[in-house]
Structures are given as structure tokens and as C-alpha cells.
Amino acid sequence: EYACDTLLLSCGLIPENELSRELGVKLNPVTSGPVVDESLETNVPGVFACGNVLHVHDLVDFVSEEADRAGTCAARYILQENQSSNPGIDQESQYSDSDIGKASKMNDNNDPVIPLISTGCVRYTVPSAIHLSKMPDKLKVRFRVGKVVKNCAVDVYCNEENSEKRIKTKKRPVVAPGEMEEILLGREELLKYP
């Protein structure tokens, strides 16, 4: 028991994205936030998203970390004379059944783009796609699950010519919808697969 004067509850948060809609930013139907790549850039060149506008966070530490990454990538974008980090990406691929099974696509610059496809209990991932040429050595992928699961493993697979190869596994005693999860992907791990 804790003595207190006020209890504030934050329930059922939905990201506010009126400005994103006006700009033509594609929104994730699960999070109601923008669909982003590894740089946290949206489908609109030069528009980056982070924090609770992207997806609801549990901890301000995650928001700060994400804001730092988005700010760094936005500064890099400006310094590269406004060259988009994601030209030609089809960021709706996460939601298209026809894209399941494709390990990667090429954008207009022949840059391999890997769509992250949520399956099983995983409801969504941030980012939704990875450009290998822009990916750091290690990339934190955050996600939420749709139900409580005990004694489980989070597996990352690469689909390669109609076969799946597990490239990463992370055992968890329990996962729950109310707690954001994360898994670290290595660039070298992904470069091994076409």
C-alpha cells in the first residue's frame, strides 16, 4: 500500500498524427503511428518520427533513445543535401500477403530493403523495413505482442527461396501486450542472406 493524493492512469493511448496525415505519411494500422525504416524516416523524404507519435512507449528512456536516433538520422539527412534514406521503398509491404516470403526487395537505387513482417503473437515492429546500406552495425527492433505468453522465444527468420532460416533467437520467461519488447539485429547477420 502506498499513500497518495492522486493516481494518474494513462490507458488506451493513440498517437496523434494529424500533421503526419496532412503530409501524406503512411500510418501503421496497428500502432496508428507512422511506418518507418531503420533511420526512423517515414515514406515522406526528410520526415522522421519518434516517441509516442510513432508508437506508445512504456518508459521515457525508450523515448529519449529513439529521439536521439531520429535526430541523428535527420541531421545526417540534412548534411547529405536532402538525399532521402529511403527512396522507392514500399513501406506498405508489411501488410501485404504477397510480400510474405520475400527476403528483400530493391528500391530505386538497387539498395536491398528488408521488410520486417510480424507473425505469430508479434503485432508490429519498429522499424518496419531495413535498408542494409543505412543500417548501423547493431539495430534495436522494438515490438509488442498480442497476448501473454510464458516460457517463449522470439525468433527472427529470413525467408530465402521458399525456405526460412532462423538468424536470431531470444528466450523470454514471459511476454505481455503491456510491455514493449526488443531484439538486437546485427548487420553482418542480415548480410549473409540475399
Give a label for each model feature:
Residues 5-57:
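FAD-site-proximal beta/loop scaffold in flavoenzymes
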Residues 25, 37, 64-65, 80:
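Alpha-helix termini
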Residues 28, 76-194:
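Rossmann-like nucleotide/phosphate-binding core characteristic of flavoprotein oxidoreductases
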Residues 29-32, 57, 69-72, 164-165:
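Short, surface-exposed linear patches
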Residues 41, 54, 65-68, 101, ...:
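Non-transmembrane, aqueous-exposed alpha-helical and coiled segments at domain scale
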Residues 50-78:
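A conserved FAD-binding loop/helix module that cradles the flavin
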